[in-house]
Amino acid sequence: MTSIIYSPKDIFEQEFKTSMRGFDKKEVDEFLDNVIKDYENFNAQIEALKAENEALKKAKYQARNTVSATVQQPVPQPTRVAQSATNFDILKRISKLEKEVFGKQIIE
């Protein structure tokens, strides 16, 4: 993008040379031409940002719809056999640990 020539402070502090009948017309015209260029650049930047903003909103909407569709799909449930086998293994281990702990207490 093109660069901005004047900041708001530059415009506010601009002083023109005076000639016999007031300000130098050529200098004022050049300054105003540059201000017009700045406004055109600002408008171009605003339009580009609006387009980018709209594209991002569409992408966000599409991503949200994709996530919603994914979340709505049923999650496969784990098989009951694997869960019962896990429970059985846990019970065996607890039983073994109890025998070790209580067996040592009986000996003492």
UniProtKB/Swiss-Prot annotation:
Gene Ontology BP terms: cell division; regulation of cell shape
Keywords, in A-Z order: Cell cycle, Cell division, Cell shape, Coiled coil, Cytoplasm
Predominant cellular place of this UniProt entry's protein: cytoplasm
Top-rank taxon, per record: Bacteria
InterPro entries found in the cross-reference section: Cell_cycle_GpsB, DivIVA_domain, DivIVA_fam
Coiled-coil region(s): 32-69
UniProt keyword annotation of Coiled coil present: yes
Purpose: Divisome component that associates with the complex late in its assembly, after the Z-ring is formed, and is dependent on DivIC and PBP2B for its recruitment to the divisome. Together with EzrA, is a key component of the system that regulates PBP1 localization during cell cycle progression. Its main role could be the removal of PBP1 from the cell pole after pole maturation is completed. Also contributes to the recruitment of PBP1 to the division complex. Not essential for septum formation.
Family named by the database record: Belongs to the GpsB family.
HAMAP family documented for this protein: GpsB
Name listed for the protein in its UniProt record: Cell cycle protein GpsB
Species annotation: Streptococcus pyogenes serotype M49 (strain NZ131)
Organism placement in taxonomy: Bacteria, Bacillati, Bacillota, Bacilli, Lactobacillales
